[in-house]
């Protein structure tokens, strides 16, 4: 019986990996400019992590780009994000995912801002039908790990299957490509991909 279960799990993992690229999307929000613990960067920490995930899975990419940019300065961005959290704001973003229905697996990436998912990511989640989709969160942080973002996504998307997410320190995503690639590879392997 154990051999049969192992065989079936192996087949399921191979099938999932083979079909992942065709039906997978990596969508993410990232902040360039001044980032905590990494300084001023041209490409945000989460963008770097998202691109590694897309490269390793063959998934398509969609960046959640705000209509109104967040301030480049860390302190000003902190003030803007805190105000959004306090007010429950839903900032608008540019463009949208083409052919949403073709994607079965959605990776959702974001930085953890003061223990929370940035509100613009909630805008994206609330604007799309995730029923029947597999959602895989990932985030960058500087000490808070996933915070409670896994639970928040599960609560926001009750009709989706939410798999275990990945948390990578922003400084690692920004400055250590090898460690980031290994963290992603290990995580995907743990998910059976």
Predicted regions and their residues:
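Short, well-ordered secondary-structure micro-motifs
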Residues: 37, 74, 148, 175-176
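Glycine-rich phosphate/pyrophosphate-binding loop and the adjoining helix
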Residues: 161-193
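Sec-dependent N-terminal signal peptides of Gram-positive bacterial secreted proteins and lipoproteins
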Residues: 3-21
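Extracytoplasmic/periplasmic soluble domains downstream of a signal peptide or transmembrane helix
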Residues: 23, 29, 62-64, 140-142, ...
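N-terminal beta1-alpha1-beta2 submodule of the flavodoxin-like/Rossmannoid cofactor-binding fold
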Residues: 22-105, 115, 182-193
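Helix-loop-strand module that forms the ligand-binding subsite of alpha/beta enzymes
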Residues: 71-161
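Second-shell loop/turn segments in exported
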Residues: 34-41, 108-111, 136-143, 170-174
């Amino acid at each position: 019986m154990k051999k049969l279960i192992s065989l079936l799990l192996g087949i399921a993992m191979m099938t999932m990996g083979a079909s992942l690229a065709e039906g997978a999307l990596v969508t993410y929000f990232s902040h360039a400019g001044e980032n905590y613990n990494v300084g001023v960067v041209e490409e945000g920490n989460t963008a770097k992590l998202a691109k590694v995930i897309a490269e390793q899975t063959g998934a398509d990419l969609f960046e959640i780009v705000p209509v109104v940019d967040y301030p480049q300065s860390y302190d000003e961005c902190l003030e803007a994000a805190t105000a959004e959290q306090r007010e429950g704001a839903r900032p608008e973003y540019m463009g949208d995912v083409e052919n949403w229905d073709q994607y079965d697996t959605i990776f959702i990436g974001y930085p953890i801002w003061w223990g929370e998912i940035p509100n613009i990511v909630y805008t994206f989640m609330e604007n799309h039908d995730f029923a029947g989709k597999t959602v895989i969160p990932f985030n960058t942080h500087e000490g808070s790990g996933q915070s409670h973002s896994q639970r928040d996504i599960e609560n926001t998307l009750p009709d989706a299957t939410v798999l275990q997410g990945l948390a990578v320190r922003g400084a690692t995503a920004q400055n250590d490509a090898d460690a980031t690639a290994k963290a992603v590879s290990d995580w995907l392997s743990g998910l059976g991909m």
